């Protein structure tokens, strides 16, 4: 036998620390880990902690120039998933210093940047994150939040009503504005650009903005209520996106919209800052979420994407409908709806909430029930979501 061992080391030795007491400032993550056959769960959990913090596959001399104990992620608890073979929940604690302040982008690059392609894992899913106040306080959060939005709109004690203009692609700007007027005049609070309406050849963004603004002012004058249309500012560059938001502000409309996953968190945070500085509400659509959150055992659960959006900033976010879905889905959906709206959310595994989350004073986000709902769903929707929600039809 050879007298030395090749330098690939066991992660367990350094990164699996079952005795670790988590700090109030740590960012905590719950991963659903499916190890490859033959890989012990402790090694898989430790590998996740290592690869998403200070680890690399071997020992390098520069390790001696820093304090691993201060900067390493630690897998501090592992439990098997009930009813699933070879699946475990690995809990990982990250020291706060690993993250740039006020950057959701950096948080995700660190926590989910590399580990998902890891050989020792068959699959990996980020189920939940605990964001400590020490970190969340470095974010502005939603431009306005639920209470300020109600004050701006002068609408209280009920869900807000909206609808998406259809056909979503192909209408001219003038006919589009006409549909907006009819909906708002008929009693809706909001109408919405579809998520893929940006600035296509058949309807350029500025034409749409102008005709929709005309519709809003006409409907407001006739009803005596404040009306809005989610003008989609999503664009190919963040400069162009801000340009569209500036135009919306100059037109005096109340709200713009962004596709935050396709547009990206950096662009979204910039837009949220602009919206707060200029009194615009920000409606967030989650196009592309199912690419990331649909698989049970791999990807990122939507509750994490929802928490990230509350930090990055948005006043509304699409969050599923529950109606007509499975019962279990209902509790989980209501779990992340609470994470969006409330200040303090208790750990509750039955609702998929792995950690107690304290948002301190960060404004809340209105959940938007959207997608395949119609008027007969109203009683169920109001019962499920309560007053602080947007019911988005069409």
UniProtKB/Swiss-Prot annotation:
Residue(s) carrying N6-carboxylysine: 192
Residues that, per the record, bind substrate: 114, 164, 168, 286, 318, 370
GO biological processes: photorespiration; reductive pentose-phosphate cycle
Residue positions where N6,N6,N6-trimethyllysine is found in the record: 5
Keywords annotated in UniProt: Calvin cycle, Carbon dioxide fixation, Chloroplast, Lyase, Magnesium, Metal-binding, Methylation, Monooxygenase, Oxidoreductase, Photorespiration, Photosynthesis, Plastid
Predominant localisation class: plastid
Alphabetized Pfam families for the sequence: RuBisCO_large, RuBisCO_large_N
Compartment(s): Plastid, Chloroplast
Cofactor notes: Binds 1 Mg(2+) ion per subunit.
Site (Transition state stabilizer) location in chain: 325
Signal peptide range in chain numbering: none
EC class name: lyase
Active site: 166 (proton acceptor), 285 (proton acceptor)
Documented EC number(s): 4.1.1.39
Role description: RuBisCO catalyzes two reactions: the carboxylation of D-ribulose 1,5-bisphosphate, the primary event in carbon dioxide fixation, as well as the oxidative fragmentation of the pentose substrate in the photorespiration process. Both reactions occur simultaneously and in competition at the same active site.
Family, similarity comment: Belongs to the RuBisCO large chain family. Type I subfamily.
The name this protein goes by in its record: Ribulose bisphosphate carboxylase large chain
Organism: Victoria cruziana
Encoding gene (name): rbcL
């Amino acid at each position: 036998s050879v007298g030395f061992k090749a330098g690939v080391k066991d992660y367990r030795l350094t990164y699996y620390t079952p005795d670790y007491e988590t700090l109030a400032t740590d960012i905590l993550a719950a991963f659903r880990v499916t190890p490859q056959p033959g890989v012990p769960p402790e090694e898989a959990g430790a590998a996740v902690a290592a690869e998403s913090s200070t680890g690399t596959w071997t020992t390098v001399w520069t390790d001696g120039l820093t304090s691993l104990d201060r900067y390493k992620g630690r897998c501090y608890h592992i439990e098997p998933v009930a009813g699933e073979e070879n699946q475990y929940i690995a809990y990982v604690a990250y020291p706060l210093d690993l993250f740039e302040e006020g950057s959701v982008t950096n948080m995700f690059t660190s926590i989910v940047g590399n580990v998902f392609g890891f050989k020792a894992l068959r699959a990996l899913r980020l189920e939940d994150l605990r964001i400590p106040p020490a970190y969340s306080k470095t974010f502005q959060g939603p431009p306005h939040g639920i209470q300020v939005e109600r004050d701006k709109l002068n609408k209280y004690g009920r869900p807000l009503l909206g609808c998406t203009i259809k056909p979503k692609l192909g209408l001219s700007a003038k006919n589009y504005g006409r549909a907006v007027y009819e909906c708002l005049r008929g009693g809706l609070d909001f109408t919405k650009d579809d998520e893929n309406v940006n600035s296509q050849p058949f309807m350029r963004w500025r034409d749409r903005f102008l005709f929709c603004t005309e519709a809003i002012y006409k409907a407001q004058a006739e009803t005596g209520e404040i009306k809005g249309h989610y003008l989609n500012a999503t664009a190919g560059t963040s400069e162009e996106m801000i340009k569209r938001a500036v135009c919306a502000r100059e037109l005096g409309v109340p709200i713009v919209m962004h596709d935050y996953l396709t547009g990206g968190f950096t662009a979204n945070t910039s837009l949220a800052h602009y919206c707060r500085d200029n009194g615009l509400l920000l409606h967030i659509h989650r196009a592309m979420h199912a690419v990331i959150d649909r698989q049970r055992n791999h990807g990122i659960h939507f509750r994490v994407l929802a928490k990230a959006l509350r930090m990055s900033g948005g006043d509304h976010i699409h969050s599923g409908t529950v109606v007509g879905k499975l019962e279990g889905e209902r509790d989980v959906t209501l779990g992340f709806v609470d994470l969006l709206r409330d200040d303090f959310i208790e750990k509750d595994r039955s609702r998929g909430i792995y950690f107690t989350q304290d948002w301190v004073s960060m404004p809340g986000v209105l959940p938007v029930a959207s997608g395949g709902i119609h008027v007969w769903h109203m009683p169920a929707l109001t019962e499920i979501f309560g007053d602080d929600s947007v019911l988005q039809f069409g």
